[in-house]
UniProtKB/Swiss-Prot annotation:
One of its GO terms (cellular component) is plasma membrane. This is Multi-drug resistance efflux pump PmrA. CDD domains: MFS_MdtG_MDR_like. It comes from Streptococcus pneumoniae serotype 4 (strain ATCC BAA-334 / TIGR4). It is a multi-pass membrane protein. GO terms for molecular function: transmembrane transporter activity. SUPFAM superfamilies: MFS general substrate transporter. The gene is pmrA. The keyword Membrane applies. The chain crosses the membrane at residues 12-34, 49-71, 84-106, 140-162, 167-186, 217-239, 248-270, 306-328, 340-362, 366-388. InterPro entries: MFS (IPR011701), MFS_dom (IPR020846), MFS_MdtG_subfamily (IPR050497), MFS_sugar_transport-like (IPR005828), MFS_trans_sf (IPR036259), Tet-R_TetA/multi-R_MdtG-like (IPR001958).
């Protein structure tokens, strides 16, 4: 058996996640302009731009369980390579699309073959000692956050100098680099389970520690992503409503970035704290903290105040998705960890699809402040449900 240094894998996986996060954030901000450049009429630009973004998430949600099954059968490293190389084509190929239909088709395929980040997460979760899983997965999550923050700056610079299509070529090169780094440096001593000893998916969900918590954690991932994405479509408009008329996009970008930076700062610390006090305990506290911050955001009186609240919000996010991942890692047999992470990713993707639509609908009916109130209510229900589900386990550190 090959000796694996999980810390070396963590470093490479972190950089791969950084490149993937940067690639995603490089594409999304320019989608409406690119759709317009493809000849779509002004009245349909918003629809097709939204479709190009959401179709990728929907197809990813549908195919994620399939890749999870294959990862448990053949290994997580092959799935990381598969995702990196396939997305090199589907994302880099956007530079050559002649019309909107090819754009939608490639975005659909991108979702079908996506999965670098969840497979990297499953790989590290399968190798790291259980008592350090919170810290390791928290650190790993900062790679995506750092990439997401860096991407728009790089993309804006490249787009201004060379055009939007060049940005897509850059994205393709990022993803190709992530695949090459995985091939060369990620180590996995995967031992395929004999077919007669393999755990069927139905049995896997009942063989995990505390099976009744599994769906609850999936729903928590949905709520976390739903609440985060429901704010996205209205944030710039809310900032303008608070009195910001000059440099609106710049100020809105700063507010978004402030949360990302604080999240990146806190994720590793929160992961270590979760390992020390219990990830389930910290998850409930972090959700309660989120409810308070959402309520404060709803009552912000200036863009500066909103930015401060969003920065404070980011400090708690390091205990949310990384906390869920750590709990899933500790509860699940290693032979089925990729499938469990894949199903969790389905709920995460669905939250990303439903959240923006729900946020826009609430804003249209009740105003921008109402989006934060509604979001805080959703998170409060999830927090209360988790508190009830964890009630017998709050006395112990590990579950």
């Amino acid at each position: 058996m090959t000796e694996i240094n999980w810390k070396d894998n963590l470093r490479i996986a972190w950089f791969g996640n950084f490149l993937t996060g940067a690639s995603i954030s490089l594409v999304v901000p320019f989608m409406p302009i690119f759709v317009e450049n493809l000849g779509v009429g002004s009245q349909q630009v918003a629809f097709y731009a939204g479709l190009a973004i959401s179709v990728s998430a929907i197809s990813a949600a549908l195919f994620s369980p399939i890749w999870g099954i294959l990862a448990d059968k053949y290994g997580r490293k092959p799935m990381m390579i598969r995702a990196g190389l396939a997305m090199t084509i589907t994302m880099g190929g956007l530079a050559f699309v002649p019309n909107i239909y090819w754009l939608i088709f490639l975005r659909l395929l991108n979702g079908v073959f996506a999965g670098f980040v969840p497979n990297a997460t499953a790989l590290i979760a399968s190798q790291v000692p259980k008592e350090k899983s919170g810290s390791a997965l928290g650190t790993l999550s900062t790679g995506v956050v750092a990439g997401t923050l860096t991407g728009p700056f790089i993309g804006g610079f490249i787009a201004e100098l060379f055009g939007i299509r060049t940005v897509f070529l850059l994205v393709g090169s990022f993803l190709f680099l992530a695949a090459i780094l995985t091939i060369c440096f990620i180590k996995e001593d995967f031992q395929p389970v004999a077919k007669e000893k393999a755990i069927p998916t139905k049995e896997l969900f009942t063989s995990v520690k505390y099976p009744y918590l599994l769906l609850n954690l999936f729903l928590t991932s949905f709520v976390i992503q739903f609440s985060a994405q429901s704010i996205g479509p209205i944030l710039a408009l809310y900032v303008r409503d608070l009195g910001q008329t000059e440099n609106l996009l710049f100020v809105s970008g700063l507010i978004v970035s402030s949360m990302g930076f604080s999240s990146m700062m806190s994720a590793g610390v929160m992961g270590k704290l979760g390992d020390k006090v219990g990830n389930h305990r910290l998850l409930v506290v972090a959700q309660f903290y989120s409810v308070i911050i959402y309520l404060l955001c709803a009552n912000a009186s200036s863009p500066l105040q909103l930015g401060l609240y969003r920065f404070l919000f980011g400090l708690g996010t390091g205990a949310l998705i990384p906390g869920v991942n750590a709990l899933l890692s500790k509860m699940t047999p290693k032979a089925g960890i990729s499938r469990v992470f894949a199903f969790n990713q389905v709920f995460f993707y669905l939250g990303g699809v439903v959240g923006p639509m729900a946020g826009s609908a609430v804003a249209g009916q009740f105003g921008y402040h109402a989006v934060f109130y509604a979001t805080s209510l959703c998170v409060a229900f999830s927090c209360l449900f988790n508190l009830i589900q964890f009630r017998t386990l709050l006395k112990v550190k590990e579950i």
